[in-house]
Amino acid sequence: EKLLNNVNMILPYAFSIVDSIGALSAQSLEKYALATDRVLDSKISLCLHTHNSMQLSFSNACAFFALNLKRNLIVDSSLYGMGRGAGNLPTESICDYLNQNYSKEYDMPLIYSLLDTCISHFYKAFGWGFSLKYYLCAKFGLHPDYALYLFKTKNLPLGLSSKVLRMIPDDRKDTFDISLIENLCKQVFEETKN
């Protein structure tokens, strides 16, 4: 509440609820959004920014709009869900949903054209989106760089990746620690040899 009172003194255009890991449940989102709405000045827009590690971005955005809060709501999205790792909420999905369910008038042919002309080559070059390794990081509450390391550097099978990720201690989950993950990988490799 103290944070929101300070935000009210600044009176920014918007305040965001952010799911950095991509594991926010609809129930938790509702709890945070309603608690924020009670304290946040009504002139401040409420924004939702989600990562799509567990494929929850779209359902959480729909749940956010369904709360029918009496303020301006913003949902952050990107074309084709472009974003680091598992990506973000796809603009094309949420705009189509808002057109169908809230009488919005987003120009879907234009959005699809942008996907073809501006985004598809980035996707081919860099890739992003659902990956079981990012899913596991979200499930275990870990920084997504752990998945990136296992995927790009170690190329571990999912079973071994899961074992390594489960071994990360609670106090080391929020920040990527390369020496920790390397030691855990060595430990798992040694166990599989025996």
Residue ranges and their predicted role:
Residues E1-N194:
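Catalytic cores and adjacent flexible loops of soluble metabolic enzymes
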